[in-house]
């Protein structure tokens, strides 16, 4: 099961793999509603990414050693800022409940 220590380990691994990025944990882990079925939902804001899909796959692989289910999304700060006030988007959810684990705020 995911706990606070696991979340911090995951964030540390992502910070090493994507220097200069902002990392926000959202979903049940951010709300403090972790259960045995929870996964770790993370949004990573990177300054420049050639392929968001390839980067999401790469960052998921970075978390494999933790042995937890994880959903890693990659976005630009511009996209986040544009959609964060629009209900029924993932960006809206992240803006409302996300926990920022990096000083470079989106």
Give the label of every model feature segment.
Residues 39-41:
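Acidic Asp/Glu-based divalent-cation binding sites
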Residues 1-22, 30-36, 47-106:
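Catalytic core of pol beta-like nucleotidyltransferases
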Residues 43-45:
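Short hydrophobic/aromatic beta-strand micro-patches
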């Amino acid at each position: 099961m995911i706990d606070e220590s696991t979340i911090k380990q995951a964030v540390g691994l992502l910070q090493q793999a994507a220097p200069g990025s902002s990392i926000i944990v959202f979903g049940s882990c951010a709300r403090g509603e972790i259960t045995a079925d929870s996964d770790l939902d993370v949004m990573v804001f990177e300054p420049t990414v050639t392929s968001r899909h390839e980067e999401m796959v790469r960052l998921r692989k970075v978390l494999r050693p933790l042995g937890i289910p994880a959903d890693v999304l990659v976005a630009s700060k511009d996209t986040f800022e544009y959609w964060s006030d629009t209900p029924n988007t993932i960006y809206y959810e992240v803006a409302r409940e996300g926990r920022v684990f990096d000083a470079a705020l989106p």
